[in-house]
């Protein structure tokens, strides 16, 4: 049944009576704008001016394209737009000024600038007699409009859509002149600033629309899982009738106010219906709308968040609008690329930090299947939140956000601001949202974790001061997730957690596993999806050529260079917090997230055969879908590098459970070889979201290597440039540079003393002895008793400069560290020097072959060891590490430190074998590829932070 929310009461709007009908709600209002009181901050207007945005393509026209622009220093909020002259430039709309050289980039807060725009447009002849409306989907930050010299409107919220009825400003036929003044600062503009770039300009679509004098002003869709549809409509004018029909995904009419046995919408089953709404006047259709919607019900049961009666887990990320070339102009292609990568990482939830996204984003979230926490934009500006005059500003922003996005099934929750103090007007805003804008969804206040916890520790009164139905604290420790947040009285969503910083992403696996098994914690969103990169074409790598060893090609810079004079600027380390680089190249952390968030997986780390079968244990972390017919496990069984058999299956496994699965293996495993079961897991939409490789009947590889290295080939040290080194640290990550200032060794490759007993502050006992045709190295290292953080401790070698490729048997292909190792899987891996993912520690290594292109070089083998590959200007440094620290999260020290005074004595052993390219043992042919067949290095950048290059002499003592 079509219902209205007014309960049959008679209401008054500006003296005009609201007319209510049982099936259709007709509200008569005037054509004038809704105006809130004029305050000292801004004229607060209804963002949509009593007009429902049209969906009929014949009733709208894009004004995107080339406009004229002049940018001047300072804020001019009084002068009308000046006459265009030769000082004006051209800019595409949408387009940010910074991307086209009109101003310099600024972070956190926009520079004080004013931009003047001019363009012209024609009104289609078919629209004569209709109301003409301009729609701006986003302009940073505040703006005023003139059409043909007449003031047409004003808006002061950069990330919100606003519309303007310009009918009375038009002049006859022909070109209409549009002028616009954009200012970057005004009272309340802080609400549009965040820990983010602060660009300027018209950055979203501009659309011209036509509406009849009698028209729809608003439309709200509500659904029940039983198939009932409630549509509330608001009509401007008298005597009109609204009719609805519901179409299924194939375009077939299935009802008008109810659908029998509806398909329910979830992120796993994003089935969309279409509501076709027709406004008729005297029996003639004068407006037609089409809105896609889904049947779903969101409820809270105690402290459990449920969708369609089922508890759900939100596997999330936060996501700024970021394009490294166009700044904040986001194309469909880029959003689709993001969402494809998210699906492949099993992400099912996006927080639109810290503002509503462009309209197309929500359409794609609806159709592809994502849950969204949609954010009302007030980021900075805390000082304003104790001032009553800013309450209407918050109301305006909430109204503009919610009215635009309320019919999207993907939007589950409204987020009110970000990390703001909970002042009186913030708390009242929540009540306003719930009672006046949308009673069907919960709202929340994302909070700094320490601030949130104060409410429960008696430091900020007693209990949380708002009835917000969901708690949304930030950055809990692993212990807090396991303790403090376990039994809250409302659902908990960590709207920011496990902050990435460069390649630091420690402990996400443990945090997510606790979230996964705790009913009252509904999920979380990792900060941040993508680096906040701004294009730059200055600061070329010439500094390196001029002898500055701390910059350019060799040395740390908080930038990504795509060429020697262009790349992405991240404003120091503030914007280097993405799972992806700004151009969407994944960092290793992306693959760690992919493994930890996986919707389905084989839980076994080792498999054994029994009666010609492998018994697997399979876990399903979908909330609604059985794996049967929805997920495919493609598998391959290999021995050494030979794949012997392949297959695929789709197990019968209900949501939230684990089941055994027996896989028939038609060939008996050869115990003398390395046997692996490789699993690739793909959903029904073709998104491959997990790769696994699991050892089958594993055994020690070392005896096989010692027996198989039959060729005598000389001293391994003949391909080593600088003798035996002690590694007592590593190249610092972004996080370590901040947290370990004065605590780490900047020169961490230490040469042995003349007697071989010390290396810098470390006592060393290193012994070598022949082992067949290899050399066996045993060592013990004892650091001094200082607070020095060593990060890595072991034995290292600078290899001959011609050695430029590595192959290894162990965990890969990405670097792995304590607290960040889940993405590593056992197998046969290879990289060439220069590859983006070349450097770093690998865990669980049994053998590593380092050669030149012809196959000459060095074989290092060990038992389940840590082996590090590092690039320098003089060649590759390979290390066998006896101790490795974690890389830490952003805000805290690593939970896995290697501190000199605490580590005591560490020891280890490994073997080296000199490989002669002209006399390679058959075993090496069996286990490794010929070096010439190794794939070319993946090198999307010239250099980049965290995997930057260093000069050997700068890191050696």
What annotation goes with each model-predicted range?
Residues 99, 168-231, 235-237, 248, ...:
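An acidic-aromatic loop/edge-strand motif
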Residues 46-53, 59, 93-103, 190, ...:
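Extended substrate-binding grooves/exosites of carbohydrate-active enzymes
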Residues 49-54, 70-74, 112-216, 253, ...:
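Accessory beta-strand-rich segments of carbohydrate-active enzymes
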Residues 43-135, 186, 190-194, 199-202, ...:
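Extended carbohydrate-recognition surfaces in non-catalytic/accessory domains of CAZymes
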Residues 46-54, 152-153, 173, 177-210, ...:
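Glycine/proline-rich low-complexity spacer/linker segments in large multi-domain proteins
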Residues 258-260, 641-672:
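Intrinsically disordered, low-complexity Pro/Gly/Ser/Thr-rich segments with frequent PxxP/GP/PP motifs
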Residues 138, 184, 266, 670-672, ...:
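Beta-strand/loop-rich accessory regions of lumenal/periplasmic or secreted enzymes
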Residues 171-175, 232-301, 671, 678-679, ...:
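Extended acidic/polar, glycine-enriched regions
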């Amino acid at each position: 049944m079509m219902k209205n929310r007014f309960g049959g009461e008679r209401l008054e709007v500006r003296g005009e009576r609201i007319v209510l009908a049982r099936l259709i709600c007709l509200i008569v209002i005037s054509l004038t704008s809704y105006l809130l009181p004029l305050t000292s901050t801004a004229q607060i207007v209804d963002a949509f001016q009593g007009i429902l945005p049209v969906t009929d393509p014949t009733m709208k026209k894009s004004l995107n394209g080339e406009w004229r622009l002049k940018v001047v220093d300072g804020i001019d909020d009084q002068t009308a737009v000046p006459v265009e002259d030769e000082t004006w430039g051209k800019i595409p709309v949408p387009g940010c000024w910074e991307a086209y050289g009109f101003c310099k980039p600024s972070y956190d807060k926009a520079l004080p600038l004013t931009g003047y725009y001019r363009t012209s447009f024609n009104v289609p002849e078919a629209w004569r007699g209709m109301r003409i409306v301009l729609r701006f989907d986003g302009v940073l930050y505040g703006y005023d409009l003139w059409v043909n010299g007449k003031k047409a409107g004003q808006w002061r919220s950069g990330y919100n859509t606003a519309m303007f009825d310009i009918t009375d400003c038009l002049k006859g036929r022909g070109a209409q002149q549009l002028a616009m003044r954009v200012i970057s600062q005004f009272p309340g503009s802080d609400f549009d600033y965040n820990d983010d770039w602060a660009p300027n300009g018209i950055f979203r679509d501009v659309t011209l629309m036509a509406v009849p004098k009698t028209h729809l002003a608003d439309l709200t869709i509500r659904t029940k899982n039983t198939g009932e549809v409630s549509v509330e409509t608001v009509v401007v004018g008298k005597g009109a009738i609204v009719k609805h029909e519901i179409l299924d995904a194939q375009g077939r009419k299935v009802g008008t106010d109810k659908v029998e046995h509806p398909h329910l919408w979830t992120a796993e089953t994003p089935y969309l219906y279409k509501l076709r709404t027709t406004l008729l006047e005297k029996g003639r259709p004068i407006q037609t709308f089409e809105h896609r919607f889904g049947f779903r019900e969101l409820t809270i049961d105690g402290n459990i968040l449920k969708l369609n009666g089922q508890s759900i887990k939100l596997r999330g990320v936060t996501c700024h609008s970021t394009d490294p070339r166009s700044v904040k102009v986001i194309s469909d292609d880029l959003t689709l690329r993001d969402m494809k990568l998210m699906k492949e990482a099993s992400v099912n939830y996006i927080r639109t930090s810290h503002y509503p996204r462009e309209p197309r984003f929500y359409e794609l979230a609806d159709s592809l299947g994502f849950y969204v926490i949609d954010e009302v934009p007030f980021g900075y500006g805390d000082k304003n939140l104790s001032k009553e005059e800013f309450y209407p500003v918050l109301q305006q922003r909430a109204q503009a956000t919610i009215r635009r996005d309320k019919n999207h099934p993907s939007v589950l929750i409204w987020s009110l601001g970000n990390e703001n103090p909970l002042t009186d007007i913030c708390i009242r805003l929540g009540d306003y949202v719930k009672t006046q804008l949308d009673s069907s969804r919960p709202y929340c206040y994302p909070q700094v974790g320490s601030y949130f916890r104060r409410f429960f520790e008696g430091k900020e009164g007693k209990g949380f001061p708002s009835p917000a139905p969901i708690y949304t604290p930030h950055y809990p420790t692993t212990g807090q997730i396991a303790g403090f947040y376990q039994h809250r009285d409302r659902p908990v969503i960590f709207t920011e957690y496990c902050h990435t910083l460069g390649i630091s992403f420690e402990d996400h696996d443990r945090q997510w596993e606790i979230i996964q098994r705790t009913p009252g914690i509904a999920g979380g969103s990792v900060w941040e999806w993508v680096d906040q990169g701004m294009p730059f074409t200055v600061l070329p790598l010439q500094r390196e050529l001029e002898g500055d060893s701390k910059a350019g090609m060799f040395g740390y810079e908080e930038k990504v260079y795509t060429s020697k004079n262009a790349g992405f600027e991240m404003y120091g380390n503030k914007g280097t917090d993405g799972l992806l680089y700004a151009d969407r190249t994944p960092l290793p952390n992306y693959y760690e997230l992919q493994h930890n968030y996986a919707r389905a997986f084989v839980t076994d780390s080792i498999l054994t055969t029994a009666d010609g079968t492998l018994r697997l244990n399979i876990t399903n972390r979908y909330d609604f879908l059985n794996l049967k017919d929805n997920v495919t496990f493609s598998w391959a069984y290999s021995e050494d590098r030979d794949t012997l058999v392949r297959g695929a299956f789709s197990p019968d496994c209900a949501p939230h459970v684990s089941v055994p699965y027996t896989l028939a293996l038609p060939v008996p495993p050869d115990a003398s070889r390395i046997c692996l079961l490789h699993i690739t897991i793909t959903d029904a939409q073709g998104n491959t979201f997990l790769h696994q490789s699991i050892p089958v009947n594993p055994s020690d590889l070392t005896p096989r290597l010692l027996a198989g290295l039959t060729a005598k080939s000389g001293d391994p040290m003949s391909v080593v440039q600088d003798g035996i080194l002690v590694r007592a640290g590593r190249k610092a990550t972004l996080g370590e540079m901040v947290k370990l200032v004065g605590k780490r060794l900047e020169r961490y490759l230490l040469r042995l003393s003349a007697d071989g007993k010390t290396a810098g502050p470390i006592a060393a006992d290193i012994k070598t002895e022949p082992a067949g045709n290899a050399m066996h190295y045993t060592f013990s290292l004892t650091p001094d008793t200082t607070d020095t953080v060593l990060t890595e401790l072991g034995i290292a070698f600078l290899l001959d400069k011609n050695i430029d490729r590595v192959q290894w048997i162990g965990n890969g292909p990405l670097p792995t560290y304590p607290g960040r190792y889940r993405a590593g899987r056992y197998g046969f891996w290879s990289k060439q020097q220069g590859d983006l993912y070349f450097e770093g520690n690998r865990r669980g290594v049994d053998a590593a072959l380092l050669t030149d292109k012809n196959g000459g070089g060095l074989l290092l083998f060990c038992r389940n060891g840590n082996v590090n590959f590092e690039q320098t200007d003089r060649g590759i440094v390979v290390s066998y590490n006896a101790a490795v620290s974690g890389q830490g999260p952003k805000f805290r020290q690593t939970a896995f430190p290697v501190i000199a005074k605490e580590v005591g004595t560490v020891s280890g052993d490994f073997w080296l074998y000199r490989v002669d390219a002209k006399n390679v043992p058959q075993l090496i042919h069996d286990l490794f590829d010929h070096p010439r067949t190794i794939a070319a290095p993946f090198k999307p950048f010239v250099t980049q932070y965290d995997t930057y290059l260093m000069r050997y002499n700068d890191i050696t003592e």
